[in-house]
Amino acid sequence: MGVCSWISVPGADRDSSAVASAIAEHLSPTGLLLQEIYRNPAAQYRHYDHNLTRIELSGSYKQEEHAVIDQIGQGFRYAAFHADSYIRRGNHTIWGSAGYRTGRTMHTVWNESADFELLYPYVWGDSVGGSLSSEHYTFEGGYARRFGRWTWGIQADYRAEIEYRTVDPRPRNVVSDLNLSTGASLAVGKQYTVGLHIEAQIYRQSSSMRFLAPLGGPKEYQMLGLGMYSVRFSTGGDQSSVYYKGGSYGIGVELFPDNGRGWFALLHYSRWRVKRILPDAPYQKLPLTTLNDSRADVEFGWIRHGVLHRWGFKTHGTLANRRGTEHIYGDASGSSNYPLLGSVQQYLNNRNRAEVVCLWGMERPNGWSLYTECNGQYAAFEARYLDPARRMQFSKAGGGADVIVGIRRGHGMLRFTLCSSYLATLTSDLLTTGLDPESAIGQALRDTYARLRSGLLLYGVSLHWSHIWQCNTAFYVDGTWKHGSFDDGNRVDYARIACGIAF
């Protein structure tokens, strides 16, 4: 979670002071403690006290010396455009955003599908891989209205993505991802509001493969998890394809203070389901696997503002489990239909996480501000394949701290942040029954396990500068750099630079 100073600009004209206050409010560290509450569209009605529109250009870079997860790659190079707006008028609030991103994901292997984290382990891939180019579009819009003690809101966001490679193997992935949510809230007493929201997702991805080399290309494996793959349906044919059809639903309950000061809590549950389908002849839209993922989140915390000081804390816990089912088919009949003989649940994955965040800040009348944030966290991951028995497990614990110094002088604002954290390995285990450790798949699985279980030291700096013009507009620049060192010697670097205008 990023944090920054809360800055006002006394002495400036009314318009420039308003945009300065809006920028500071959108970057407020105490406000970010409440971020999960605003999944309820009704809560967006009082998300901010000031209206703000931002238009931004950015570039980002990430490079891992060795890919921690081969299927995600060694990093990326992206250029992006993003615009967002939040406007409140009387009892009405509207918000929205639009974005475009283009670039490359570097050196992926054993995965030719998009959205690996959504679909794993049910992707298809090969031992060659390579860098992937992509174009990514996002659109979001929402509306909330207050009726006395009641508030109602609705939100929709849509993501479209095209991912491809121009050398063999040549995947082409097209993603369509629509999310809808609606919610209501009721003011109880003079300070608090209780909210309820529901959400739904519709997800589609078509993934096709081509080889232009005269001798064809590598075998495309239909992955089943922990080095397992479907022998029967893994092919190396040109113009083969995979189709993903899925969606999710969720429900959340929230308690939060009207003025952003006091106790807050939430409980959220969601369930995700997606089928991997083989659409080409002779399979005739055959469902190969079904993936189910359930997740429950619970959070509570407290925020207080004094004359000079701010305090806050929150605790967050997540329990998630993923279950994968393989469908078993008989031989195709004369009509090319494969009879379904049965289904078996073979893949199980549990992910648990707990985090505690504590925040203290001080705002001085002379324009200086200082914030410190400390956090502790625990994470556990376990994946199992039932027959043959395979298992990957690791758990980690650690903590970190951020120090943020802010200053404002006239129409200028500056924020400097130092951050550091360390995650240490507590337990780890790998069981690979029946897997040849010298095979390409066996070596890839062992390398991934070694990197995932490794402890990580992460540190970095960020800088924000903005200048308020008299015409109710601000120009700003954001820069971030982070470096990570793993206990096994692997390294990762991340950098992002952005500039934009706000009004």
What are these regions (language model features)?
Residues D15-V19, K190, R491-F503:
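Outer-membrane beta-barrel "beta-signal"
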